[in-house]
Design a protein with these regions (language model features):
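A short beta-strand element within the Helicase C-terminal
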Residues: 344-359, 381-385
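Conserved nucleic-acid-binding Ia/Ib motif block in the N-terminal RecA-like helicase ATPase lobe
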Residues: 29, 37, 85-156, 168-171, ...
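Conserved helicase ATPase core of P-loop NTP-dependent helicases/translocases
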Residues: 133-137, 289-300, 305-343
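Conserved interdomain hinge at the start of the Helicase C-terminal
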Residues: 244-301
C-alpha cells in the first residue's frame, strides 16, 4: 500500500529555497541562487519536504509546475550524500518520452550542478543524434547523471560496457510516465527495468511523475516504487480541466482541397483579433507540417506584417529541432507547424491558439493539444479543421464543448 496521498494547495504562499539551508547541500543552494531560483513551486515544496530526500514518490503534476526541479533536487541531494561517490558510473537515471524533454531536463540538471566541485557530468541519450559519438562519450566519460529516452537507452544496454555503467544506480526517475506509455514505450520500460539492478536488491530511490495514473502505470509501479511510497498531487480534484474551459470549435470543409484555405482564414481572423498571435498548428504528418511551414513562410504568415514561422517534425535533425524549441519559446508571437513530435512534456509559453488539422490519433491526444493554450488563467482557443469523413470525431466526443461552425 502506498502512503497517504497529499493534494497540494496551489494557492498557498510560496516558500523560499533558503528554508532548506541545513537540509540541502550548500552547492545546490548556491546553484539555485546563482540561476535565479528563489521560491519553490507547490510541487517542489511538497516533494522537498518529505521526511527524507530518499523517499520514493508518485507525483501527479502537469507540465509547467516545476516538476523537473522537484525530482532533480532530491536525486542530486541523494547522490551528493554518498561517501566516495563513483563519478564514472551512472548514479541518477531519468527516463523521458521525447528528445526535447530530455534535453530540457539535462539543461536544468547542468544549472543545478554548476556549483559542484568536482563537477557532475550529465549525459543525454536520445534518438536522432549520432549514436556512435554519444555512446563513445558516455563510455569514456563520467556520466554521473543520464537522461534518456527509452528507445535509445535500450540501444545502449545492448553494449556490455554500457550496462556496467548502470550497476551503481542511486535513483531512477520516470518523467511524464503516462506520456511514455501513450507513445508505446511500455515494453521498452519493462526491458530497461529488467536490465538494470533490481530495486529490491540495489535499493535505489524511485520517483514517478505523471499527469495521470492509468492502470498501465499502476501495474509498473512495483518495479519502481516501494509499497510505502508517498503520493503527491498538484491537480485539484475540483478544478475543471483545461479542455472544459478553452473555447473550442470545428470548421468542416467540403473536401481536402479546402483545408489549406480554411486554415489560412482561421489564422488570418485570429491575427486580426490579436496581432501578437502565437499558435501551434498540428498537422497529420511530418510531410504536412513541412509543406505548410514552407507555404506560410513564403506568404508572410497569416497576414502582413509577417509572423515568424516555425516547424517541428520528425524528419528534422535533432539540432534543428532544438533550435526551433528555443526560438519558439523565446518569441512572443509566431506560427509553429508541428507533427505529433511536439510531446506533452514540451512547455511553450503564451500559446493563444491551437489548430488541429484532421482527427487526433486518440481522445487523450486531443485533450493534451487543447491543453497547450489557456494556461495559467490566460485566454486561449482551440480549432479543428475536418474533412467530411472526419466529422465522426465530433459526434463520438459530445463531452467536449466543441462548437460546430460553417466553413469560413
Amino acid at each position: 500500500m502506498a502512503g497517504d496521498s497529499v493534494v497540494v494547495d496551489n494557492s498557498a504562499p510560496r516558500v523560499p529555497y533558503a528554508q532548506l539551508a541545513g537540509r540541502l547541500k550548500p552547492q545546490l543552494l548556491r546553484a539555485l541562487e546563482n540561476h535565479g531560483f528563489v521560491h519553490m513551486t507547490p510541487v517542489q515544496e511538497k516533494v522537498l519536504h518529505l521526511p527524507t530526500f530518499t523517499q520514493d514518490c508518485l507525483v501527479q503534476a502537469k507540465t509547467g509546475t516545476g516538476k523537473t526541479l522537484a525530482f532533480l533536487l532530491p536525486a542530486l541531494q541523494n547522490l551528493l550524500s554518498v561517501p566516495d561517490l563513483d563519478r564514472s558510473t551512472v548514479g541518477i537515471l531519468v527516463l523521458a518520452p521525447t528528445r526535447e524533454l530530455a534535453q530540457q531536463i539535462a539543461d536544468e540538471c547542468d544549472k543545478l550542478t554548476s556549483a559542484c566541485t568536482p563537477p557532475l557530468e550529465c549525459h543525454i541519450a536520445v534518438g536522432g543524434s549520432n549514436r556512435k559519438t554519444h555512446l563513445s562519450k558516455f563510455l569514456r566519460g563520467k556520466p554521473t547523471i543520464l537522461v534518456a529516452t527509452p528507445g535509445r537507452l535500450i540501444d545502449y544496454l545492448s553494449e556490455d560496457a554500457a550496462r556496467q555503467k548502470l550497476t551503481k544506480l542511486r535513483c531512477v526517475v520516470l518523467d511524464e510516465a503516462d506520456r511514455m506509455l501513450d507513445a508505446g514505450f511500455a515494453p521498452d520500460l519493462r526491458r530497461i527495468l529488467a536490465q538494470i539492478p533490481p530495486k529490491a536488491e540495489a535499493g535505489w530511490q524511485g520517483m514517478c511523475f505523471s499527469a495521470t495514473v492509468p492502470p498501465e502505470i499502476q501495474k509498473m509501479l512495483p518495479m519502481v516504487l516501494d509499497k510505502d511510497h508517498a503520493r503527491i498531487s498538484t491537480i485539484d480534484p475540483n478544478e475543471a480541466p483545461t479542455v472544459a474551459l478553452v473555447p473550442q470549435s470545428v470548421f468542416p470543409v467540403a473536401s481536402v482541397d479546402d483545408i489549406l484555405p480554411t486554415v489560412h482564414s482561421v489564422l488570418a481572423c485570429a491575427r486580426a483579433d490579436n496581432p501578437a498571435l502565437k499558435a501551434v498548428i498540428f498537422c497529420p504528418t511530418a510531410r504536412h507540417a513541412a509543406l505548410l511551414y514552407h507555404i506560410f513562410g513564403h506568404t508572410g504568415g497569416a497576414a502582413p506584417p509577417k509572423l515568424p514561422v516555425f516547424q517541428m517534425q520528425s524528419r528534422m535533425s535533432q539540432p534543428a529541432r532544438t533550435r526551433t524549441v528555443d526560438e519558439f519559446k523565446a518569441t512572443d508571437r509566431g506560427l509553429l507547424f508541428a507533427s505529433d513530435v511536439v510531446g506533452r512534456g514540451m512547455d511553450f509559453p503564451d500559446i493563444n491558439l491551437v489548430v488541429q488539422i484532421g482527427v487526433p490519433s486518440e481522445k487523450d491526444q486531443y485533450v493534451h493539444r487543447v491543453g497547450r493554450t489557456g494556461r495559467a488563467g490566460k485566454v486561449g482557443e482551440a480549432v479543428m479543421v475536418l474533412a467530411p469523413e472526419e466529422m465522426w470525431f465530433i459526434s463520438a466526443n459530445k463531452d467536449f464543448p466543441i462548437k460546430n461552425n460553417c466553413p469560413l
